[in-house]
């Protein structure tokens, strides 16, 4: 039997059991509810019976016909031929009053415009920057007049704000002062009679507390400092925890070395401040050293050392680490030597020698050292002793020493040349004195008379020069009065250096008299250039192997080798024939000092060398386009032929002639100097309105030599003056008269970025 039929029969039997009631029978609410519950139960029963079949039946979709009228049940608009709108859907809603809230929401949505697309991140950041720039420029623009005023001020004295004087109570002011004069005592008596507050405090404790209490700004600053201190403390604690977790041995090794260096510096500082505490620290360090020495960790016997030894051949850092460990092992295993009593007695004499530093011995032993003037006295004493023993062989020995030193060291020091000149002059004077005793008295008388004539003539010439006020470099001939001195003519090769030597000048009358006595002897009173000629003549006979270049080695500056124009050479004796005006001792000392300082400076040669280098650098360079293996065989050791080089060589065109071509003593650089351009003014400075004003100011001297004392002080007044002992605080808005904004503009921008972007978009649309 089918299940459906069973269900229908059950339903019919259930209906038969129901009692038929009349139509007008009144039903209560409970009865209505019971009927609805019965229907619901009946429906559930039918569904349960249907499900007993065991097969899932598919529910067929109900078909509905499209209606031409648009309502909440049908939204088709095919029949009307128009698009479906929101108003069509809202027509049935208008009639019903129960959907008031829905109507309001729909009206609100209808009134709103289409939502714009959100801007990308780059555009938002750009808008933020623009707004922040405009706000910041607006805030900073209020400082422009103050900056302009400070720039225009002739002088700024910091601190700008005047310090307020400290308000002291009257009892503090009168604590160290008493009435001494009768008038003061009378005034104080009157005040005491009237009970005026002379010594009583004017302020109550509450008023004092209010004055001493910090302001709101100070409290905020104090709180900010405490917050910063707490943040730093937490930061360092986190850093310490992080470092504690690091397992790298290399990191801990580096940290350990850094701590050791820091401890060493602190120990040195502590040793200067508190020696007793430093001694205790020294004992702790010694105990740590003993413990480290007992552990013997630095013998290159561990796993780490063995692995580093394998890589030391290829890795430089590993090799360096091995060397450091070996050095540490050597330092730790080193025994501390303690001297015994016998050794102390024996070494007592050596202590005194060790007190003198080795640097002093090096200075005395090293003749070619940095300061040869320190051993000048020692060398001069030894030379004088040698001249006393054998005065006849002095010139030959001196020449031999000069030649030997030149052969060993070509670049002779300036100080050595001055020392040799001084020693040779001393030897010449002593030799002349010895030979003067051996000559007959007759020759002495004749030579004394001739020397007196020379002196008288020289005095007359000096008197004439004083009267006529002639120039110092005027020449006067004294051929008839000067005694004829017999001397050998030097060889042609030696003539040129002799002529280039400068004649020595006579400074005082006492020196003239001494020279008059010495000039009477033949081959003795000649200065150094003549003696050098005689020595150069003797040295080739004695030593034929000596080269001729040594004759011209003593010459410091040879003008003939450098100057482009040849100057006429004049043969002149070394005996002074001209007397210049008497000079002061200060000028003489100054000239002697300059002479000693620039004795060995070959400035002309250096200058001409520098000029040649500048000319070569300014010449245009030829371009060589030769390639190896192009048209010829190429390879290692093969060079292109000269023909190929000439073929592929592009010669540079000759540049314009240099401005200093015909000026031997001038170098004119025609290229732009980058270093000088950095110091040149590109834009006219602020106070000036025309370039001529600036040039006139630069050209005007500001020294006290060309200006009065008052003008000099005004010109050299410093632009900024600071008072010593005063704290220069930054300028505030309250000091100038502005009100400082409590809230910054930038946080406002960061708090409301959407508001700024929408406003910016509206401005762009407008």
From Swiss-Prot:
GO terms for biological process: cell differentiation; meiotic cell cycle; rRNA processing; spermatogenesis. Residues 533-542 have a biased composition (Polar residues). There is a cross-link at residues 121, 447, 517, 732 (Glycyl lysine isopeptide (Lys-Gly) (interchain with G-Cter in SUMO2)). The keyword Transcription does not apply. Residues 14-42, 365-563, 734-766 are annotated as: Disordered. Its main location: nucleus. Keywords: Coiled coil, Developmental protein, Differentiation, Isopeptide bond, Meiosis, Nucleus, Phosphoprotein, Ribosome biogenesis, Spermatogenesis, Ubl conjugation. It comes from Homo sapiens. GO terms for cellular component: cytosol; nucleolus; small-subunit processome. The keyword Nucleus applies. The modification Phosphothreonine is found at residue 204. The modification Phosphoserine is found at residues 28, 51, 76, 80, 403, 405, 443, 451, 567. Encoded by an autosomal retrotransposed copy of the X-linked gene UTP14A. Evolution of autosomal retrogenes from X-linked progenitors compensates for X-chromosome silencing during male meiosis. It holds the Pfam family Utp14. The gene is UTP14C. It comes from the Eukaryota. This is U3 small nucleolar RNA-associated protein 14 homolog C. Expressed in testis. Residues 396-405 have a biased composition (Low complexity). Essential for spermatogenesis. May be required specifically for ribosome biogenesis and hence protein synthesis during male meiosis. It is found in: Nucleus, Nucleolus. Residues 466-475 have a biased composition (Basic residues). Residues 407-434, 502-527, 545-555 have a biased composition (Basic and acidic residues). Residues 216-245, 316-346, 452-470 form a coiled coil. Belongs to the UTP14 family. InterPro entries: SSU_processome_Utp14.
């Amino acid at each position: 039997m089918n299940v459906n039929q069973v269900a229908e029969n059950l339903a019919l039997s259930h209906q038969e059991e129901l009692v038929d009631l009349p139509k007008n029978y009144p039903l209560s609410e409970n009865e209505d509810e019971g009927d609805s519950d019965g229907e619901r139960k009946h429906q559930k029963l039918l569904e349960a019976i249907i499900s007993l079949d065991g097969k899932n039946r598919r529910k067929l979709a109900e078909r509905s016909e499209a209606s031409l009228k648009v309502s909440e049940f049908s939204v088709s608009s095919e029949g009307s031929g128009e698009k479906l709108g929101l108003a069509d859907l809202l027509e049935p809603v208008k009639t019903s009053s129960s959907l008031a809230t829905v109507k309001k929401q729909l009206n609100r949505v209808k009134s709103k415009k289409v939502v714009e697309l959100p801007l990308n991140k780059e555009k938002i950041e750009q808008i933020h920057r623009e707004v922040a720039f405009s706000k910041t420029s607006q805030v900073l623009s209020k400082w422009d007049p103050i900056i302009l005023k400070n720039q225009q001020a002739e002088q700024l004295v910091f601190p700008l704000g005047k310090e307020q004087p400290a308000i002291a109570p009257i009892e503090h002011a009168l604590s160290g002062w008493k009435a001494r004069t009768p008038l003061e005592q009378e005034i104080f008596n009157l005040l005491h009679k009237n009970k005026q507050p002379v010594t009583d405090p004017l302020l109550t404790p509450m008023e004092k507390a209010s004055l001493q209490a910090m302001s709101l700004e100070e409290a905020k600053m104090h709180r900010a400092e405490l917050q910063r201190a707490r943040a730093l403390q937490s930061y360092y604690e986190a850093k310490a925890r992080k470092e504690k977790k690091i397992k790298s041995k290399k990191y801990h090794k580096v940290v350990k070395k850094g701590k050791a260096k820091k401890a060493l510096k602190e120990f040195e500082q502590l040793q200067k401040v508190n020696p007793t505490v430093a001694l205790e620290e020294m004992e702790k360090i010694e105990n740590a050293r003993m413990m480290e020495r007992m552990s013997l960790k630095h013998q290159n016997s561990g796993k780490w050392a063995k692995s580093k030894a394998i890589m030391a051949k290829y890795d430089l850092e590993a090799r360096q680490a091995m060397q450091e460990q070996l050095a540490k092992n050597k330092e730790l295993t080193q025994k501390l030597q303690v001297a015994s009593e016998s050794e102390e007695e024996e070494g007592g004499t050596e202590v005194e020698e060790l007190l003198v530093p080795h640097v002093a011995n090096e200075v005395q032993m090293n003749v070619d050292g940095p300061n040869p003037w320190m051993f000048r006295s020692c060398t001069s004493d030894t030379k004088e002793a040698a001249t006393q023993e054998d005065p006849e062989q002095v010139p030959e020995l001196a020449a031999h020493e000069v030649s030997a030193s030149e052969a060993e060291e070509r670049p002779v020091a300036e100080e050595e040349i001055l020392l040799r000149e001084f020693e040779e002059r001393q030897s010449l004077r002593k030799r002349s004195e010895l030979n003067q005793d051996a000559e007959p008295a007759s020759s002495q008388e004749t030579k004394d008379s001739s020397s007196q004539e020379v002196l008288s003539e020289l005095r007359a010439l000096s008197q004439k020069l004083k009267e006529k006020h002639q120039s110092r470099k005027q020449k006067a001939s004294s051929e008839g009065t000067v005694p004829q001195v017999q001397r050998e003519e030097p060889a042609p090769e030696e003539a040129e250096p002799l002529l280039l030597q400068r004649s020595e000048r006579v400074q005082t009358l006492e020196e003239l008299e001494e020279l008059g006595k010495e000039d009477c002897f033949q081959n003795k009173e000649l200065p150094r250039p003549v003696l050098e000629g005689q020595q150069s003549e003797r040295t080739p006979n004695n030593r034929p192997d000596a080269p001729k270049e040594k004759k011209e080695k003593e010459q410091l500056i040879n003008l003939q080798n450098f100057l482009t124009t040849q100057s006429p050479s004049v043969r002149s004796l070394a005996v002074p024939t001209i007397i210049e005006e008497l000079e002061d001792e200060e000028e003489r000392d100054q000239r002697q000092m300059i002479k000693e300082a620039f004795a060995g400076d070959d400035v002309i040669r250096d200058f001409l060398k520098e000029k040649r280098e500048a000319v070569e650098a300014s010449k245009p360079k030829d371009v060589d386009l030769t390639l190896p293996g192009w048209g010829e065989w190429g390879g290692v050791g093969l060079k292109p032929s000269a023909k190929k080089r000439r073929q592929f060589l592009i010669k540079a065109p000759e540049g314009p002639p240099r401005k200093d071509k015909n000026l031997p003593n001038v170098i004119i650089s025609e290229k732009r100097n980058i270093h000088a351009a950095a110091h040149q003014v590109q834009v006219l400075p602020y106070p000036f309105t025309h370039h001529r004003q600036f040039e006139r100011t630069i050209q005007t001297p500001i020294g006290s030599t060309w200006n009065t004392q008052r003008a000099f002080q005004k010109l050299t007044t410093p632009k900024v003056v600071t008072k010593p002992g005063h704290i220069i605080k930054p300028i505030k808005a309250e000091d100038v008269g502005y009100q400082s904004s409590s809230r910054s503009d930038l946080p406002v921008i960061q708090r409301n970025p959407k508001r700024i972007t929408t406003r910016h978009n509206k401005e762009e649309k407008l």
